[in-house]
């Protein structure tokens, strides 16, 4: 049983998911947008500088994006299962026993010199499908 909060998992399956996401990002320039971070604002430079593609995992209108979303969700679900197996307390502290609710996520690319420029959060605290105020775990792939 691990007591570390942060875990790193690596295997050929996860690497294939990452390669697929990178290829999708390069191929789908039509979906790329300037990254957005929510914060106090008013600064000279934005909280982050990136190029993002937002995906909605339940949206079947774009078969290419939906297919990638499905692969990413399966990969994250496998990582989550391993994570909570190593940390069983997570299963007991989540009241609804639902640890994976995330139909919306971003692919973010940072070119040299880009990235986080100031304190920020990626989501507001408004009522959104991602329920950010109730987030227990976040994934960076």
Predicted features and spans:
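Fe(II)/2-oxoglutarate oxygenase catalytic core
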Residues: 1-141
């Amino acid at each position: 049983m691990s007591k570390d909060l942060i875990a790193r998992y690596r295997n050929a399956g996860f690497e294939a998911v990452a390669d697929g996401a990178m290829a999708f990002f390069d191929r789908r320039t039509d979906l790329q947008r300037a990254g957005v971070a929510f914060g106090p604002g008013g600064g000279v430079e934005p909280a982050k500088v990136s190029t993002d593609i937002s995906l909605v995992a339940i949206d079947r209108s774009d078969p290419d994006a939906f297919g990638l979303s499905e692969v990413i969700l399966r990969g994250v679900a496998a990582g989550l299962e391993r994570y909570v197996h190593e940390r069983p307390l997570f299963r007991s502290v989540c009241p609804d026993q639902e640890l994976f609710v995330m139909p919306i996520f971003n692919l973010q690319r940072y070119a040299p010199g880009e990235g986080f420029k100031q304190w920020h959060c990626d989501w507001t605290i408004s009522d959104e499908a991602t329920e950010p105020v109730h987030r227990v775990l976040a994934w960076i792939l």
